[in-house]
Structures are given as structure tokens and as C-alpha cells.
Amino acid sequence: MNNKFYQLTVISAENFIFSNLVKKSNITGSEGNLGILPGHAPLITKIKPGLIHIISSKNIEEYIYLSGGILEINSNVVTVLADTAIRGKEIDEKKAIESKKNAEELILKSKERHEYIRAVIELSKAIAKLRVCKLSNK
């Protein structure tokens, strides 16, 4: 492998999602957005609900929704272990819109702090799914 690309693997609890050489990826880490290029310093961090934007070695763009998990970078090998990962083209937009509406309603109705926090997490996941869906279909 040369220094223009690195191996990226995305695995969810349910499925093997992606494995290929890539030029670049961007992912939502616990401390903010991470841009990953070949030769990135070793790192292990939590990832928040959001997306990973991938540019393959053949300049093909792909977006994958991630519900959270762990990111490991080590010697031009990047591994994402996600709780849930869904390719953008596989996301049901109508379901995501419905999930967003339900979460918004739960936020308004929540009486306990833990209910509110759970609803906010569900809202962030639904918004991330919608974003991935829109980016994948443009």
C-alpha cells in the first residue's frame, strides 16, 4: 500500500458495511469532526451519532450513517466499530422523517430529565440519518 491511500473498514454489530482503500474520510468524533488522511497519527476515540464521508481511491464518494461507536487509527489502517451503520442509499427517508417527528414530540412531552436526554439522542440520530440520505441522493 502506498502513502496516497489507507485501508478503511466499517463494521456494525449487525453487519460488515465497508472495506476498501480510501483517500480521505471525515467522521464525527466525540471531540468534533475528524478529517482522516493517509499517515494520520494513531488514535482511538468514541464516535457520536452522525456520518462518515468517504472518498475512495477511485474518487467515489460514499456516506454512511453511524449511530455511535469506536474509531481506531493505526498505521494507515482505520477501523470503525459502530453500534449501527447504514449506507446512505439504504436509509428509508420516510422512516427517518417519522423518527424525527416522534423525537421532537417526545422532547416537548418529556417530564423527566432522562426522558428528555433520550429524546434528544433519538432526534440527533434521526437528523443524522436524514442528512446522510440527502447527501447520498444528490
From Swiss-Prot:
Record carries keyword Transmembrane: no
Zinc is among the record's keywords: no
Topological type in the membrane: Peripheral membrane protein
Subunit structure: F-type ATPases have 2 components, CF(1) - the catalytic core - and CF(0) - the membrane proton channel. CF(1) has five subunits: alpha(3), beta(3), gamma(1), delta(1), epsilon(1). CF(0) has three main subunits: a, b and c.
Function comment: Produces ATP from ADP in the presence of a proton gradient across the membrane.
Family: Belongs to the ATPase epsilon chain family.
Protein name: ATP synthase epsilon chain
Source organism of this protein record: Wigglesworthia glossinidia brevipalpis
Gene: atpC
